[in-house]
């Protein structure tokens, strides 16, 4: 019976081992770059505002415990805005007669989209991302979005 004679020394072993390790890392990076990214929705950060059908078009709904207002626009879209004034952080209220949010501290006023109507506030109310799942409205209450102006991309449609 013949024995295998592997003429391998320590240096060549480590050299091959190192090349193998580098190759594996390179392959891993390439696979990660080519693999499509899927975003997993972590529902722990979301507040369930209720069923979509329970919100009438053109109405604003306060969620005091979450410190936000949910606006169902006339065109059916949803916009969740913070109830915290962007001037000094006072809690704002909604005035249905004037159709505006008003700050009791320094009289800042915001329209129903959260845009500044009267100073001293200089920027719109923060808004919260919204997702729809199983016919429910979920609001990401841990992720308020600071904005410099209102744009239609901030409104979420079914």
Model-derived features: positions:
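Short cysteine/histidine-rich metal-coordination sites, predominantly Zn2+-binding motifs
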Residues: 99-107, 117-126
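N-terminal secretory signal peptides
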Residues: 1-8
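N-terminal pre-ligand scaffold of iron-sulfur
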Residues: 6, 15-86, 90-97, 126-158
